[in-house]
């Protein structure tokens, strides 16, 4: 079963578990076919004569304990692993082939209902695993109860999550690649457009726009590698670990692993049911990637402002004002900036859940899903937004070139000229600082200073005014950066070739 694409973003109020509000949608499942749990109070469950307990669960505990409102998005993984598990049980002689066929047929009907949105959820469905088993038993009869042979919800849920995380990491790699292609295309289009480079948001040194954009390409390349690592770390099958100590049947975990696309099985049952490292890996990769997107968003907000005027965002990714008709607001870029701490928060919060958690399974681990699911949704949405927005940005070559024409950003080049004339760099730095002060105090450009004024600062520099004025030409500033990875056109072209190779070497 191929997992369906993650649904749109949800708030905690949508889930209806942290705020106490009624859940109006079921993330990952049908929107209106089931009861409004957990926001609606389920009635107290009747106790079975075989129950361990003397009184039923309190309704508020049922609401606290239930995860069905958010974990039902795992149904594709749950059905797939149940199907593989049933086949393995029959192949090992643990259940009959007739029981296997009945289970497979019943799971097919369950899958159809879930896909079509007709699955009859009930308010006493604690989680997606129990909902699937309950419905399977309604369809197939008592044989449905055989499916849980040699399986615990402890290894069942972590298997679902490993499959979901693996598939999400694969999607992230594809989506990041798409954004990398957009960045590379825009860098190629603007390879030789001068602009200021900044430190402390102050003009520092001139660069080419293509060079600047390629910085994001390499950030994204590292992000893609992190998700490839996450995919690999999600590739060990936990199913067969049982509750924690293994199971009392001679199962074939390798068969199930192969059927579900896992590379291997977890070698230790305790670690298998209690480990959530692969979720932390995804959250970490998503947090770093979201931080990179936030930096892109922040720059687009600045650059599209009237004060900078370096670019105009596409109308399709902008909004207006409810009161000021002239406004064109960079909302999409601002949200790229604002979504990052949300994902970082999920990483921090889930580290807190896992911190000092005794082995093996604890109900604390139920919290893994919301942190993971919302991070997946947020990242996929922001990656799509970043690509769509950046593809349509119109850059203003004249404004960028004019901003990069400020002679003050040639100060380092003047210092390097003095170094070539024999001065130690630290001394040259001081000389140029004095030259800048003279120009600022007199309200003139560096090129407007007279020979005597330059001589007062440093006689050696006054003897080389022709070289000084050559350094003050914009093309000289840019093309002097000849080191590998630098901003000279030759070096930027090298970076473009490396970027194309990066995409070609890891072609999907």
Give the positions of each predicted feature.
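Extreme N-terminal basic, low-complexity initiation segments
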Residues: 1-15
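Glycine-rich cofactor/substrate-binding loops
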Residues: 45-81, 143, 309, 324-508
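Generic, well-ordered alpha-helical scaffold segments in large soluble proteins
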Residues: 85, 106-113, 135, 139, ...
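Charged, flexible cofactor/metal-binding loops and thiol motifs
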Residues: 161-166, 173, 181, 188, ...
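A helix-coil-helix interface module used to build multimeric assemblies
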Residues: 45-246, 250-257, 317-320, 335, ...
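Intrinsically disordered, low-complexity segments enriched in serine/proline and basic residues
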Residues: 22-24, 29-30, 35, 44
């Amino acid at each position: 079963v191929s997992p369906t694409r993650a649904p749109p973003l949800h708030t905690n109020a949508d889930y209806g578990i942290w705020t106490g509000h009624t859940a109006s949608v079921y993330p990952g499942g049908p929107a209106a076919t089931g009861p409004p749990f957990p926001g609606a109070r389920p009635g107290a469950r009747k106790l079975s004569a075989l129950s361990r307990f003397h009184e039923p669960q309190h309704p508020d505990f049922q609401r606290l304990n239930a995860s069905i409102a958010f974990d039902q998005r795992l149904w594709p993984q749950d059905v797939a692993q149940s199907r593989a598990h049933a086949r393995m049980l029959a192949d090992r002689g643990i259940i009959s082939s007739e029981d296997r066929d009945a289970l497979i047929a019943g799971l097919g009907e369950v899958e159809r209902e879930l896909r079509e949105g007709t699955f009859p959820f009930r308010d006493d469905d604690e989680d997606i695993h129990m909902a699937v088993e309950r419905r399977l038993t309604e369809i197939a009869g008592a044989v449905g109860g055989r499916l849980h042979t040699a399986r615990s919800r402890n290894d069942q849920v972590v298997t679902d999550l490993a499959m979901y995380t693996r598939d999400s990491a694969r999607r992230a790699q594809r989506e990041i690649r798409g954004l990398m292609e957009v960045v590379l295309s825009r860098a190629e289009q603007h390879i030789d457009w001068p602009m200021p480079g900044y430190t402390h948001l102050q003009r520092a040194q001139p660069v080419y726009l293509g060079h600047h954009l390629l910085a994001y390409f390499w950030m994204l390349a590292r992000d893609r590698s992190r998700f490839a690592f996450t995919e690999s770390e999600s590739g060990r099958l936990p199913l067969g670990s049982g509750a924690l100590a293994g199971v009392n049947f001679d199962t074939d975990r390798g068969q199930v692993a192969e059927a579900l696309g896992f590379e291997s099985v977890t070698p230790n049952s305790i670690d298998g049911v209690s480990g959530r490292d692969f979720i932390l890996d995804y959250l970490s990769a998503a947090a770093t990637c979201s931080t990179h997107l936030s930096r892109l968003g922040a720059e687009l907000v600045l650059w599209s402002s009237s004060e900078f005027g370096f670019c105009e965002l596409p109308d399709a990714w902008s909004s207006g004002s409810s009161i000021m008709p002239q406004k064109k607001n960079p909302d999409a870029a601002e949200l790229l900036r604002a979504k990052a701490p949300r994902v970082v928060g999920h990483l921090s919060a889930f580290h807190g859940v896992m911190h000092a958690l005794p082995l093996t399974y604890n109900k604390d681990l139920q919290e893994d899903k919301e942190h993971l699911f919302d991070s997946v949704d947020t990242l996929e949405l922001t990656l799509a937004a970043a690509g769509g927005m950046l593809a349509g940005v119109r850059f203003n070559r004249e404004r960028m070139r004019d901003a990069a024409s400020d002679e003050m950003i040639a100060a380092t080049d003047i210092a390097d000229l003095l170094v070539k004339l024999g001065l130690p760099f630290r001394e040259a730095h001081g000389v140029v600082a004095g030259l800048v002060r003279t120009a600022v105090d007199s309200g003139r450009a560096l090129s407007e200073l007279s020979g005597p004024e330059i001589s007062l600062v440093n006689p050696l520099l006054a003897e080389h005014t022709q070289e000084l004025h050559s350094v003050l030409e914009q093309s000289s500033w840019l093309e002097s950066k000849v080191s590998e990875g630098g901003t000279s056109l030759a070096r930027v072209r090298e970076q473009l070739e490396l970027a194309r190779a990066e995409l070609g070497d890891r072609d999907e």
